[in-house]
C-alpha cells in the first residue's frame, strides 16, 4: 500500500516528471547520443539502473521468503542481500523477469511524461556530472 501511495504522489507531482527526465537523459547518455532535447525526448522514461528495480526485487524476495521464514531481523537482512544481488549480480536470467515488473512499476507509478523544462534540467545535470568526471580523470 505504501509503495502505491508513494508512487501516486511522485507521479502526480513534478518529481515524477524530473525522475522521467533523468531516466531519458541517462538512456541518451548510455546510447552515446548527443544530449539535446530532441535526442532525449525520444528516449524511454524507464531505466535499467533505477532504484525502483531494486525495491521491486526486495519486495518480491520478501514476499517469497516470508512464506518460508518467520519475521525477524534475519529475514529483512536476507531479503535485502538477495534483492541487491539480483539487482547487481550475474547471471541476469531471474533479473530479466524482475526487470519487466520494475519497468512497468517505473512507468505506471514513479515517472510521468516530462515537459521540456524538466528535460533541460536533467540534461544540464548530466553535462555537469560529465564535466566533473572529466576533471577528475575518469
Give names to the regions the model predicted.
Residues 1-19, 76-93:
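Hydrophobic alpha-helical membrane-embedded segments
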Residues 68-71, 89-100, 108-112:
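Membrane interface segments of multi-pass transport proteins and intramembrane proteases
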